[in-house]
């Protein structure tokens, strides 16, 4: 099966590679942890936001048959997530109130990410286009991150970082899987 994208035929294998690359690219948003340079942070957050939206757009055709309502919810929330990342990146250019809104945006972003990631892994589990154990790992990581995010509302920010490790490891592994192995072609 071949998809037509902008008038050009694109194989499922190429889409899997691009999705894997976009997953890795979305983690460029973490650049803010290493620098305060506006020349690095702003473009990295904008690129990460666009990558998040790109993942959803590319995955939607594969996930739709596993639950149309959930797939629509997934792509909708991913657009919101990507938009928030872009806005937070642009707010980094300002000072005062807009700059101070970055932290609340990322608190909301965390919960939006958890919902979209949970929907993503449930849809991947149902579709079987990747091994189910990767999907289960993703669901467990989402639940763990939800617990960590709720705890962060009451306790130290440092605690949340521990809960991110499980989902980050899962997503980096998934990206590698998609780049190297691609989708289970029997299920697509």
What are these regions (language model features)?
Residues 2-188:
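Hydrophobic, aromatic-enriched alpha-helical segments typical of multi-pass transmembrane helices
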């Amino acid at each position: 099966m071949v998809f037509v994208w902008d008038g050009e035929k694109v194989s499922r294998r190429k889409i899997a590679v691009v999705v894997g690359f976009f997953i890795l690219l979305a983690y460029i948003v973490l650049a803010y942890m290493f620098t305060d340079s506006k020349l690095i942070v702003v473009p990295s957050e904008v690129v990460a936001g666009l990558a998040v939206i790109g993942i959803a757009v590319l995955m939607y055709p594969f996930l739709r048959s596993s639950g149309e309502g959930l797939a629509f919810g997934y792509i909708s929330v991913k657009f919101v997530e990507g938009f928030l990342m872009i806005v937070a990146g642009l707010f980094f250019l300002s000072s005062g109130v807009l700059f101070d809104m970055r932290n609340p945006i990322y608190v909301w972003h965390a919960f939006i990410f958890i919902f979209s990631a949970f929907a993503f892994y449930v849809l991947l589990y149902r579709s079987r286009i990747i091994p189910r154990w990767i999907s289960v790992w993703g669901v467990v990581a989402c639940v763990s991150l939800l617990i960590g995010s709720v705890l962060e509302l009451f306790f130290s920010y440092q605690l949340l970082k521990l809960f991110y490790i499980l989902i980050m490891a899962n997503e980096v592994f998934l990206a590698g899987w998609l780049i190297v192995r691609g989708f289970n072609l029997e299920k697509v």
